[in-house]
Amino acid sequence: YFGEGGFKRLINEGTFFPNTQFNYISGGSTTDCASLMTGTLPAHHGILGDFFFEQKTREVIPITFDGKSVGIGSQENHSPVNLFASTFTDVLKVSTNAQSKVFSIALNASNAVLLGGHTADCAIWLDTESGKLATSSFYEKGLPSWCDKMNTDFSLDNMTDFIWQPLYAPFTYNYPSANDISSKNFLYKAEKYKNINKKITAFKSTPFANKLV
């Protein structure tokens, strides 16, 4: 990731902003994703928080919920219909006469949808219920073939049977705790989660999930 073909390439050959600020109080990760992708504030792009209250049904639902879309590989229905502003990926599509390829992938549906914008070829997320890569019928072509292959050939059990602990002795790190610590004090095992949903939720909070996406 940190080699010549990783982040260094993005910094040296891409567009890189080392110091970017938005003058608002964060309403959650979805609000932040929308602000970063549109370059504007929540008052303009409409994503004010992770959830909103639907008065008709009296339910609290995800901000990207779309009753007209159907989940593919997921029971969740999501699309960018509630995003009022264009993202830079939308502008990229327009400026290249739709020749650019735009795919977004994230650990949860709302972030994937907002990162992709309105014109993405596909937004992909890791579904908590199924443990599979999923998308929405909003994207006409559905899941890319490599996602289908991964869902068929790859068992998430191989990654969710994780043990998360320090790679080296704690005292060798730059900022060790002032308290007497050991690797045992920072040890997380997936085996304690018997429920698959809880297991995947815990997995999403580890570096192994970042490696997956």
Label for each model-derived stretch:
Residues 41, 49-213:
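His/Asp/Glu-rich, glycine-adjacent segments
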Residues 2-45, 101-105:
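Short, structured active-site-proximal loop/turn typified by the sulfatase FGly-forming signature C/S-X-P-X-R
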